[in-house]
A protein has these predicted regions:
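Amphipathic alpha-helical segments that line or abut small-molecule/effector binding pockets
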Residues: 25-44, 93, 101
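Amphipathic alpha-helical packing segments from all-alpha helical-bundle domains
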Residues: 55-80, 89-101, 131
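N-terminal intrinsically disordered, cationic/polar leader segments
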Residues: 1-10, 55, 128, 132-141
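C-terminal peripheral helix-coil segments that are non-catalytic and often amphipathic
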Residues: 75, 89, 96-97, 105-141
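Secondary-structure edge/capping motif, primarily at the C-terminal ends of alpha-helices
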Residues: 18-22, 46-49, 77-80, 106-110, ...
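Cytosolic nucleotide-binding catalytic cores of signal-transduction proteins
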Residues: 82-83, 127
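Basic/polar phosphate-binding segments, predominantly the helix-turn-helix DNA-binding elements
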Residues: 1-4, 38-40, 44-49, 53-68, ...
Length: 141
């Protein structure tokens, strides 16, 4: 149980620091970068946790952290649009799963790629995607 408590505590502490004030469209890349950098800072710990029975803790931590980041961005981009709450949540979940999947693969591979390179590639691939998804989900327009 002690290892689970340590993992949970470490994750919560890092999450608070990583995302402080970085949940907007203009700052999400910085928030995602800081998540990756915080994982890389304690690389040995997180790789060991990932390969142990407590991997689920890392996954749950990343899902919560990334959803909180993405729902902030989605809500900001949806301002002034008529979009159902469940559609906004779906968009945030979609990006959450993409980001967490990439992050878990990065951990599984030993965290070799630079966090900034990952964020740059994600930013390039997703550019405009949230706004386009919200536009497609608009009600009555």
């Amino acid at each position: 149980k002690d290892i689970y408590d340590r993992v949970e505590w470490a994750c919560v502490e890092e999450a608070t620091r990583a995302l402080a004030g970085k949940k907007t469209y203009d700052t999400w890349q910085q928030g995602f970068l800081q998540i990756l950098q915080s994982l890389q800072k304690d690389k040995v710990f997180y790789i060991n946790v990932y390969h142990s029975i407590s991997r689920e803790y890392i996954e749950q931590y990343l899902y919560k952290l990334t959803y909180d980041l993405m729902i902030g961005v989605v809500e900001e981009r949806a301002a002034g649009m008529s979009v159902r709450a469940e559609d906004k949540e779906f968009i945030a979940h979609f990006y959450k799963y993409a980001f967490v999947g990439l992050t878990l693969e990065w951990i599984r591979g030993g965290m070799k790629e630079a966090p900034a390179a990952i964020v740059e590639r994600v930013s390039t691939v997703t550019h405009g995607g949230i706004t386009n998804a919200l536009e497609a989900c608009r009600i009555g327009d």
